[in-house]
Design a protein with these regions (language model features):
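Conserved serine DD-peptidase/penicillin-binding transpeptidase domain
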Residues: 137, 172-195, 199, 223, ...
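Membrane-proximal periplasmic segments of bacterial cell-envelope enzymes
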Residues: 1-216, 223-224, 249-255, 261, ...
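C-terminal, active-site-flanking charged/polar segments
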Residues: 550, 572-595
């Protein structure tokens, strides 16, 4: 009879029951000669990831494996053990799909070295399989419970939440002290990875006491597993799902971002297509992961924060604000805006062949007049408007906890000299002034810029995480909604730009009428650009802005990726998606943007929202130390940082293309930085005579 491993350990005290029913305090057990103990770890459940209202984005469930429970045999030679185990495998195959494959040596060595631990023979059981087997497994088979990660909303916010996976396969061979009883989980992507330490709990401990003949004397849980902390995001799950639904109906590939201007909180960051996070539980096969990578729609790639695209005409408000702030133009300055202008040997066109005539800045924004912006961009100069763009967050990652976030690109003379072998020329300036050329930004950056213009004087510091809480609900870290980067621009200049953006949607001849709302004035800017290799003839469309006009509260950006040879425009494709989103939320938006009422002191009962938190595990089988039910519960979120009152200003109280900058698709065997880097698309074609990028006339409405 094989004996247990010869490991020495102090015999624990405390209430426990021996295999034959004796107490742990029974002196006979303590006095057994050559008795040995083995300590095992009980992996703790990960803490939940929640939306701002306490809705779970990631939590845990109890899943079950089918396992062989060897027990102690009177006669235990190799042939007998292998034959007995084979019969258990045959029985298991009758009830579940995908029973694991074992060699005779595997079956024998598990009995020889670790028969006191179950041998898992299946993946997670399906609900139907579990119900069929519950209480009917037969001799030698057991249902073995483990904690499994669960993503209740499937693909919702998949690029932000990320996914988790097993740290490694369970060990084989002789048992070592402090081995995990089942596979431990670690974050592999997104918040799951970036907040892995906060989400991980503290393992529990179990000790097994054996006699010299290998029979189990005592099984004792000495420490219960302690669940991980709670990560509360700024996302609004209802809004996130609505945005994803709008994208699903409106495009095959695109992105939708919404930011609370008052706090900088990211409420929505949707990318289409996404992927079901539950496909990664408990793990994903190499074949399935490769299929996701090879999918031409690139579901693992977040267009919202990893994609770098020319912002096109959605960038024009930045140029207008820079020119107004510098005094290059005033609200009343009229500039003749023909159908095209000539710079050197090149002609730069408007999107329409009809001259706009002498127009002011508000009309230029409303009509998205390229020739007005060519001229004004050159007058104010690239240093001024590109400098303001950087202040508004273009050209740098936002700093949010996002893996593979693009920095975009705002060129400098140094960058141009290094990469294009020239300084920024007038032709480059003309292209940049309409958001094209080498200028690149993500939808998240465009929405952030709109938040700054909507605010008028400052750029809110973006937030994606509201709080990280410990198991007891104590706040480990919390966002600071008061943090802002001051722009140093004339508030009146920003007001003029906002008026022009209002006319885009609500004025005569505006290019964004498709986004007009029934209950408030929305300010926006359309944008359309060529994108990708010229051979694909592919365009993308933008609609970005904020609402309401008189006291902006929400900034947004929507990106529509067109198919090759498809005619698209921001006014026709992206603007209607914005309308659909905000009209659906009409009552909620109206309430949140309503002017604050006179304060009235009242005494009322606490009706604070509930935030789902991980609580200490109570439902543990005392015999095994394994979970019997999810260790989750609810508790009032009395310590959440409140948002500012509705309506209250917190400060008062060429050929154009996009490079997939820093594109990251996370894979199970990714390198240390967790990223896979793809080759960029073909370089931009340049004019052989002057090497100046040209802006192609792209229709706006």
């Amino acid at each position: 009879m094989p004996a247990p491993p010869t490991v020495a350990s102090e015999i624990p005290s405390g209430a426990a029951v021996a295999a034959d029913g004796r107490s742990a305090n029974d002196a006979k057990i303590f006095n057994r000669p050559n008795a040995r103990t083995i300590a095992s770890l009980i992996p703790a459940p990960r803490g939940p990831i929640l939306d701002r209202e306490g809705e779970p984005l990631a939590n845990n469930r109890v899943a079950y494996h089918l396992a062989i429970n060897y027990g102690q045999f009177e006669v235990a030679d190799r042939d007998f053990v292998v034959s007995w185990a084979r019969k258990r495998l045959e029985e298991a195959a009758k009830h579940v799909q995908g029973v694991l494959t074992f060699t005779d040596e595997d079956l024998w060595l598990h009995y020889r070295h670790r028969r006191w631990l179950p041998l898992i023979v299946s993946g997670f059981l399906k609900d139907a399989e579990f119900k069929k087997l519950e209480g009917k497994t037969g001799v030698g088979l057991i249902l073995f419970p483990v904690y499994a990660r669960n993503y209740p909303e499937g693909a919702a916010a998949s690029h932000i939440i990320g996914y988790s996976g097993s740290i490694g396969k369970l060990p084989t061979g002789p048992i070592n002290q402090n081995e995990p009883m089942f596979e431990e989980i670690e974050g592999r992507a997104g918040i799951e990875k970036l907040f892995d330490q906060a989400l991980r709990g503290v393992p529990g401990r179990k000790r097994l006491l054996f006699d010299s003949d290998g029979s189990k004397l005592l099984e004792e849980q000495t420490l219960r597993p302690r669940p991980g902390g709670t990560v509360v995001t700024t996302l609004n799950l209802r809004w996130q799902k609505l945005a994803e639904s709008v994208l699903e109906k409106g495009c095959e590939r695109g992105a939708f971002v919404v930011i609370d201007i008052a706090t900088g909180e990211v409420l929505v960051m949707a990318s289409r297509p996404g992927f079901d996070l539950n496909r990664f539980v408990p793990g994903i096969s190499n074949e399935a992961f490769q299929a996701l990578q090879d999918d031409p729609s690139r579901p693992l790639f977040s267009r919202a924060f990893q994609g770098a695209y020319p912002p096109a005409s959605s960038f024009k408000p930045v140029v207008a604000l820079a020119a107004l702030n510098a005094g290059t133009v005033s609200e009343d300055t009229l500039i003749d805006s023909p159908a095209s202008i000539t710079l050197g040997n090149h002609t730069f066109h408007n999107w329409t062949k009809v001259p706009e005539g002498a127009i002011n800045v508000k009309r230029a924004i409303a009509r998205s007049c390229n020739t007005w912006f060519y001229q004004v961009g050159i007058r104010v100069g690239p240093t001024a408007f590109l400098g303001l763009a950087r202040q508004l967050g273009f050209g740098a990652a936002t700093g949010l906890p996002l893996i593979g976030e693009t920095a975009g690109l705002v060129p400098t003379n140094e960058w141009m000299l290094k990469n294009e072998r020239r300084r920024i020329l007038d032709g480059d300036t003309a292209n940049l002034s309409i958001g094209q050329g080498v200028l690149l930004a993500s939808p998240l950056q465009v929405a952030q810029g709109m938040a700054g213009i909507g605010h008028g004087t400052a750029l809110p510091k973006l937030q994606l995480i509201r709080q990280v809480q410990n198991i007891n609900g104590g706040v480990i870290s919390a966002a600071d909604p008061e943090r802002k980067n001051w722009l140093g621009v004339d508030p009146q200049a920003a007001q003029v730009v906002r008026a022009g953006m209002r006319d885009v949607v609500n004025g005569g001849g505006g290019t964004g009428h498709g986004a007009s709302l029934s209950y408030t004035e929305l300010c926006g800017k359309t944008g359309t650009a060529q994108w990708g290799p010229p051979s694909k003839n592919q365009r993308l469309a933008w609609f970005a802005g904020f609402l309401p006009y008189d006291n902006p509260r929400y900034a947004f950006a929507v990106l529509y990726e067109g198919k090759p040879n498809q005619t698209v425009s921001g006014g026709r494709m992206a603007a209607p998606m914005v309308k659909s989103f905000f009209e659906t939320l009409k009552d909620e938006i109206k309430e949140s943007i309503a002017p604050p009422k006179r304060a009235v002191v009242v005494i009322a009962e606490d009706d604070s929202r509930e935030i789902l938190r991980a609580l200490p595990v109570e439902d543990i089988d005392p015999a095994t130390g394994l979970p019997q039910a999810p260790a989750l519960d609810t508790a009032p979120a009395t310590d959440l940082i409140p948002a500012p009152p509705a309506g209250q200003d917190p400060d008062e109280g060429g050929v154009i293309r996009a490079l997939p900058v820093n594109e990251a698709e996370i894979r199970p065997d990714a390198p240390a930085d967790g990223l896979l880097h793809e080759r960029p698309v073909a370089p931009v074609q340049t004019d052989p005579d002057e090497d100046v990028r040209r802006a192609l006339p792209v229709e706006e409405p």
